[in-house]
Amino acid sequence: MAICRLRSLFSPSKCKSSSFSFYQSFKPRTFSSSHHLPSHLQNVGFIGLGNMGSRMANNLIKAGFSVTVHDLNSDVLDKFSHMGVATKKTPCEVSEASDVVVTMLPSSAHVCDLEKPFMLDAPVSGGVIAAEAGTLTFMVGGSEEAFAAAKPLFFSMGKGAIYCGGAGNGSAAKICNNLALAVSMLGVSEALALGQSLGVAASTLSKIFNCSSARCWSSDSYNPVPGVMEGVPSSRDYNGGFASKLMAKDLNLAAESAKQAGCKHPLTSQAQKIYTELCNEGHEGKDFSCVFRHYYTGMDEHVDQ
């Protein structure tokens, strides 16, 4: 079962994460034979400085943590170096310099196998906008002891950290969250495109949604119609944000997990089909809200701000 396999990957001896992971570096000078977590984690390593990771690392720096970073992109490392941040050439060097290491990487295949007695899988919700603002929500799986120790890190990068249970539960929660998000985005996009076809402006319909029973994040915070809302991917040709290929990946995980669990999943299957088609048509790098334009053929709007 997909979730069971995820839990096995999040074991202390072989930890891999598709999103954000936290683990306590194994350093003899830090740990006793009982492997108790220290009460204060000041030196933070950060591996993965993409659209999300760079912003999260910046928020840790602003919060006063001593941060050491690594990324395969040398240009990104140069930017952090010019900011006075310590940079390392390898993940191992980051680990040696840190009390705790954070990874923010696109898939499990990108995460190194490292020996670590304490680990949390902690996927995030909120996207680039929340990463920039420091208002992410973390879904956390692992030991309660490690969760308690990591709270200062979470609340330096986000507004909430929800403990979901044992190892792998954070990723399980993230899969379910993104399934609901994908389905809601499809519903909002379909309704707005239909409204346009019936002569109701998407901006007008969005106002109705946002003060009625149809209100949801895809409508009031991440509107998919270009011209309706500023500062979201639809306002910049669907660049930035959460790539359609990543949404398709999460829907594949959700579908596989549902099959293994014996759960009915008709909406998952349909959403999976639509996002796979979207990616196959060349829109895999665009934000997942581009489904409004490239699947439903909805129209841009020009709204007086």
Predicted features by range, described:
Residues P106-L114:
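Rossmann-like adenosine-cofactor binding region
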Residues A2-M104, F118, V128-A131, I162, ...:
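NAD(P)+-binding Rossmann beta1-loop-alpha1 motif at the extreme N-terminus of oxidoreductases
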Residues D99, L105-S107, V124, G142:
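Short glycine-/small-residue-rich Rossmann-like dinucleotide-binding loops
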Residues N169-H302:
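Helical "substrate-binding/catalytic lid" subdomain
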Residues M56-L60, L153, L194:
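Hydrophobic residues within alpha-helices
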Residues E115-A182:
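Rossmann-fold dinucleotide-binding core
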Residues M52, M56, M104, P117, ...:
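Methionine-biased hydrophobic packing positions in alpha-helices, especially
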